[in-house]
Structures are given as structure tokens and as C-alpha cells.
Amino acid sequence: MKFYKILNKQIYISENYSIVPIRFQDKFKIMKWRNEQIYHLRQSKPLSEEDQENYFSNTINNLFNQKQPAQLLFSFLKSNICIGYGGLVNINWNDKNAEISFIMNTELEEKEFELNWLIFLKLIEDLAFNEIMLNKVYVYAFDLRPHLYRVLELGDYFLDARLKSHCKYEKKFIDVVIYSKIK
């Protein structure tokens, strides 16, 4: 397992769920899920295996030794099986805030969406607020999944902003919503 130089604690656990520094063995599962869920991601085209290899080799591999990486990514495990991934992205070390990114195995979305999101949020917030001492975390989302907002509100997030007609989606402009939590 790789380790993030910046973190004292690498693994966060809640019952049989955990987040661990992103595992290279999960890269093709992650690619599959991203391609299946491209509609709500800031990803312009499906990823190829070559794209994914390059991203892991050239971007992710370099994050582990950085003093202040722009992102901290984790494999989300249930009983040591990867069922999702995410982390803190667009980390602003000066202003002490970061965006939370998370996707899960597409097959789990229908029945375990709320559960997996809430557990992931609990784990990543522990890291964000208690390990790297951020003041604020937020979720940036295309206004396409209202069921996500309910989950965020259950996790004590508040609607921080609505960016009107902010992104083009299927030939029309849609809003972006930002849900935040302050330490």
C-alpha cells in the first residue's frame, strides 16, 4: 500500500468500511465506474485503459510524496473489497478548504447510495477536519441528482451556493449546486 507523506494516519475505519490511500489495483474498477457515471462527472469523454494507466502513473503516483498535494484520493472498501473511491480534491491549503469527490460501484447506487455516501462522508470528514485541519469541505454537483442533496443534508451539509446555468449538459445549460460543511 502507498502512503501519503502528509498524513500521519493513512486508514480510516467505520465498522467494516474503510478508506485507504488509493490502490493501484482498483484503477480499472474506478475507470469502469467513471465511464458508467460520466453524466455527473467533469469528464468530457470515456476513459481508456491507457488514459487510466497514464493518470495513475503520472498524476496519482506523484501525490504520495508531496508536502501539500492538490488532492488526496482513497479507495473506499467494504470488508476490504473496493466499492468506491473518492477523496479531497481542489485542496486550498491557504484557505483550509477542499472539495469532496466520491463515486461508488454503479451497481450499488440504487440500494446503497445513501448508506455509502454517509459512511464515506464520515470517514473523509475525520481526515479533513482532524488530520489536515481544514475549516470547510464542500460538494460541487451538477443539478442532476436531487437524491444526493437529501443525503448531504442528512450529513449536516447546507446549500452554500447555486450557480445558475453554469454548465452545459446535453445541449442545455444547467445549474451547479454546492453543499458545504464547516468544522
Which residues does each PLM region occupy?
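A short helix-loop-beta-strand connector motif used in the catalytic cores of GNAT acetyltransferases and
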Residues: 59-75
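Sparse recognition of residues in long alpha-helices and their boundaries
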Residues: 46-47, 68, 168
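Acyl-donor (CoA/ACP) binding surface of acyl/acetyltransferases
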Residues: 1-27, 77-183
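Hydrophobic pocket/interface hotspot
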Residues: 30, 52, 100
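Short Gly/aromatic-enriched secondary-structure transition segments
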Residues: 34-35
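Short, conserved alpha-helical segments within structured domains
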Residues: 47-51, 72, 144
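Conserved GNAT-fold acetyl-CoA-binding loop/helix
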Residues: 38-60
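Generic structural signal for secondary-structure transition and capping sites
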Residues: 27, 38-39, 64, 133
